[in-house]
Amino acid sequence: MRFSIATVVLSLAAMVVAIPTTESTLFARGGGQTCAQGQTLSCCQSVTSGGDGILGNLLGLNCAEIPIPIVGIVLGGKCNSAPVCCNVNGGSTSPDCDDNSNNGGTQGGINVLTNSCVAIPIVL
């Protein structure tokens, strides 16, 4: 009897899934939209060429318009560990992910608890 109870307890404990807290990896929640309606999740992969100064150019990331399926995937792998952001669909130019909002983008990644864009550390 004790063996059966111990087996059940161990089986239930093995079913718990832990999500790593590594800052460079983002996890999308499976089963729902991550970006707001009318927005697309994009990889931020190039630096801006605007007149924000050296620091602004290093931290001001442009999002390439790459639609990414966002249900149940690890975004860090899809975006090669680059930051991601939500952008309004449409438009002929790449959305801007930096914080000076000259093209209306949002710097950062997705908060899996609130489904909102958040700033994340950028590894240079």
UniProtKB/Swiss-Prot annotation:
It is found in: Secreted; Secreted, Cell wall. Residues 1-18 form the signal peptide. Disulfide bonds join C35-C85, C43-C79, C44-C63, C86-C97. Disruption phenotype: Does not seem to affect germination and growth, formation of sclerotia, ability to penetrate and infect host tissue, nor spore and mycelium surface properties. Keywords: Cell wall, Disulfide bond, Secreted, Signal. Belongs to the fungal hydrophobin family. Aerial growth, conidiation, and dispersal of filamentous fungi in the environment rely upon a capability of their secreting small amphipathic proteins called hydrophobins (HPBs) with low sequence identity. Class I can self-assemble into an outermost layer of rodlet bundles on aerial cell surfaces, conferring cellular hydrophobicity that supports fungal growth, development and dispersal; whereas Class II form highly ordered films at water-air interfaces through intermolecular interactions but contribute nothing to the rodlet structure. This is Class I hydrophobin 1. The lineage of its organism: Eukaryota, Fungi, Dikarya, Ascomycota, Pezizomycotina. The gene is Bhp1.
